[in-house]
């Protein structure tokens, strides 16, 4: 801790700093709470996303029994090709994060007379699963970025609560004591000088 100047100017500076810290701390604490809430929201979204994937897998399993041979899964895979993953950006509690918009698939034609009628349903189910997984990756990235900001904000809250504010209050206390002692000493010296002067005048 830097050595404190024991002056009235330093006292004013420390008081001003304390006011600033105490004014800024609630904003940091609120941001910390918002970030914690958003992280919980991300976890809820991931849980819901995983439940949707499981439901889609169950729907796909219904078509698996219709696959007439070992080539059917490959025929489904051949009908699926990702063209683009659409994302944007969003601001969550002051954090810039990616936002999932969807997955675009290439339109791969097939011979409707050669393929079984259930193939389109199986393709749609697999596409849905892929889209759900891509969305989950984006949510996980949101969680990671929000977590980084939460760690930084928590460090700043701790710095204010445990270091800056207590340190500034202690500086104010030390300066006030020093100024009080100096004022007391000045009064004592003044009285001594006055008595000495009165004694000299009496002797004359």
Question: Which functions belong to the PLM regions below?
Answer:
Residues 1-204:
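Charge-rich amphipathic alpha-helical interaction elements
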């Amino acid at each position: 801790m830097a050595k404190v100047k024991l002056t009235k100017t330093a006292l004013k500076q420390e008081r001003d700093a304390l006011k600033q810290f105490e004014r800024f701390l609630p904003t940091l604490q609120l941001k910390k709470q918002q970030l914690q809430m958003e992280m919980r929201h991300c976890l809820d979204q991931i849980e819901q996303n995983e439940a949707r994937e499981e439901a889609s897998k169950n729907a796909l399993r219904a078509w698996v029994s219709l696959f007439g041979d070992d080539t059917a899964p490959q025929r489904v895979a051949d009908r699926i090709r990702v063209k683009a993953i659409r994302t944007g950006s969003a601001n969550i509690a002051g954090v810039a994060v990616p936002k999932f918009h969807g997955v675009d698939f290439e339109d791969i034609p097939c011979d409707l007379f050669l393929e079984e009628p259930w193939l389109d349903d199986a393709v749609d189910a697999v596409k849905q699963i892929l889209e759900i997984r891509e969305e989950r990756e984006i949510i996980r990235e949101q969680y990671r970025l929000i977590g980084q900001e939460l760690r930084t904000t928590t460090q700043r809250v701790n710095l204010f609560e445990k270091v800056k504010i207590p340190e500034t209050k202690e500086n104010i206390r030390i300066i006030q004591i020093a100024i009080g002692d100096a004022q007391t000493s000045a009064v004592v010296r003044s009285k001594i000088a006055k008595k000495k002067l009165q004694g000299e005048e009496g002797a004359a």
